[in-house]
Amino acid sequence: MAKQIQAIRGMNDILPTQSPLWQKLEAVLRDTVAAYGYSEIRTPIVESTDLFKRSIGEVTDIVEKEMYTFADRNGDLLTLRPEGTASTVRAGNEHGLLYNQEQRLWYMGPMFRHERPQKGRYRQFNQFGVEVYGIASADIDAEVLMMSHRLWQKLGISEHVKLELNTLGDAQERAAYRDALVEFLEQHEEKLDEDSQRRMYSNPLRVLDSKNPDVQALLGDAPALMDYLGEESRGHFAHLCELLEAVGIQYEINPRLVRGLDYYNRTVFEWVTDSLGAQGTVLAGGRYDGLVGQLGGKDTPAVGFAMGLERIVLMLETLALTDDVSGPVDVYVTAMGDDCRVAAIKVAQQLREVDGLKVMSHCGGGNFKKQMKRADKSGAKLAIVIGETELANGQVALKYLREEKEQELVAQDSLAAYVAELI
């Protein structure tokens, strides 16, 4: 027997039994962004490698260790996209969507990072994100946070996540802080781990994000970024906090929050949870006012967020919030005998005219017991049975598969309306 080919490590199938939960989540995401007036954008899975080097930063874990990069037959370096923001900016610049315009966009699709696979973290993962261009005010920072909060409410997990906020200031303020931080780190270099020593000059703000408890203890005495912010950056952050308080969104200021991508400035945020074991991030984002210009466009204010859907699905399953997810079939239609098959097919087609009703027809014949077994296995709530007697009388037998109710006889011409009320 030939050896079976398996899925690539860290790249998982979503099976038919899992798809309804994914479909529910995706529907909630689409409905929520539509309520805010956002438009969908779809970009290629493969982009020029330079796009991510210039946007994410060459001395980030993603670019250094995690990107799937290859040379095509022309020798061009291409990369499977590791995140969605850079591609959205590239598309906006290329098609003239951004300069002197306001755009509110969203995307959803697969991303790729060569990470160590673990619970809630995969090498191919599905990401949902929103990106807003052309609005400098903190009002829009608040809007995307209100949108994310609304998502948690609609999914029933708002009590299981918390919002962490920080501000990184503008480029000049960060440069001044960077110098002060490097000076501090140089004084304690021998206490830093190898990773932090490597980042001390190339990307010192990332040292603040170190997961090493000894490094975090040392950073308690480090200079604070907030002390280097000017009046405008402080005002932007204060206005954001004021708006969040006005709409009742609780938050916690985390001065160590810097995010893992180089393009952020001013507002950065993460929604975190401890429902998945160790505290984990389920949504993250911030402002990236310099990225559009960095990628060849005119300087344009921008803000956005992204979330990995696998983690949200895992969270819904962990919290047992999947009971209201409907299966793929509501009604299973059967025919007892060859003469009844055409009638059964017609009945199934009529039922499919009912908006949202999911109907499966039995195919291939078989006795009553076999067909009822298939009906039960389908997960349907109702089975429609058409035998010779029902056919002669213009009726169907309606069997309840998930409730203790007596079988009913229903006229074929009123069946669709009757079933619509039941389902």
Curated annotation (Swiss-Prot):
Keyword check for Cytoplasm: yes
Keywords: Aminoacyl-tRNA synthetase, ATP-binding, Cytoplasm, Ligase, Nucleotide-binding, Protein biosynthesis
GO annotation, cellular component aspect: cytoplasm
Subcellular location: Cytoplasm
Main location: cytoplasm
InterPro entries: aa-tRNA-synth_II, aa-tRNA-synth_II/BPL/LPL, Anticodon-bd, Anticodon-bd_dom_sf, His-tRNA-ligase, HisRS-like_core, HisRS/HisZ, HisRS_anticodon
GO-annotated biological processes: histidyl-tRNA aminoacylation
One annotated GO molecular function: ATP binding
Source organism superkingdom: Bacteria
Pfam families in the cross-refs: HGTP_anticodon, tRNA-synt_His
Keyword Protein biosynthesis attached: yes
Catalyzed reactions: tRNA(His) + L-histidine + ATP = L-histidyl-tRNA(His) + AMP + diphosphate + H(+)
Annotated Gene3D superfamilies: Anticodon-binding domain, Bira Bifunctional Protein, Domain 2
Entry-linked CDD domains: HisRS-like_core, HisRS_anticodon
EC numbers on record: 6.1.1.21
NCBIfam families on file: hisS
HAMAP family: His_tRNA_synth (MF_00127)
Membership in a protein family: Belongs to the class-II aminoacyl-tRNA synthetase family.
The name this protein goes by in its record: Histidine--tRNA ligase
Protein source organism: Shewanella loihica (strain ATCC BAA-1088 / PV-4)
